[in-house]
Amino acid sequence: MPHSPTRDIQITKTGLLSKLNFVVKDMCKIKNHRTSCGNPDFYEKCQPADDFAPFLKKILEAGATLKGITICDEFFYSLIGENGHYGTPTNLNAPGCVPGGSSSGSAAALTTNLYDFSIGSDTGGSVRVPASFCGLFGIRPTHNRINTEGVYPMAPSFDTLGWFAKHIDILKKIGSVLLNSNEKTEFSFKEFV
């Protein structure tokens, strides 16, 4: 992304997610950075954020390192994964094929093997479709299960955050951080279907 952070963002080196690095969809507030939501005109008008979106702060406080911001479909409005302004992210698991969207860059980034996990959003398939197209694990939790404050909406009554990983143990760790508001219960998968 032309406006990705110029250096890694890390709050702490300890925690459940320490030594894991990630990228995030161009959809949320990142302290001292602007967001484009896949549109350069929106980026030019957007003011730098005063703080991190709460979900992002939780991930950073758990020790993960933010490596960059990923391309998404313009204003999150597609399941294809193309962006006419910034280009279509390359799905290295299926070269020549679209990565699926709208969290296209978040999924495609993991096919490079440079990142441990990525964050996206899902309104009507924007995590599930790219996970399928790119051969990844992806999860869309129940609506309102994760605080979406600081996340630019597409359809607030349907929007939720989601994440991708190549390994199920990492997917589970992210769930333990994002889905446990009181830290008393551990997130777990009941069964795989």
Task: Name these PLM-found stretches.
Residues 110-111, 116-193:
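Fold-level recognition of mixed alpha/beta catalytic cores in primary-metabolism enzymes, strongest
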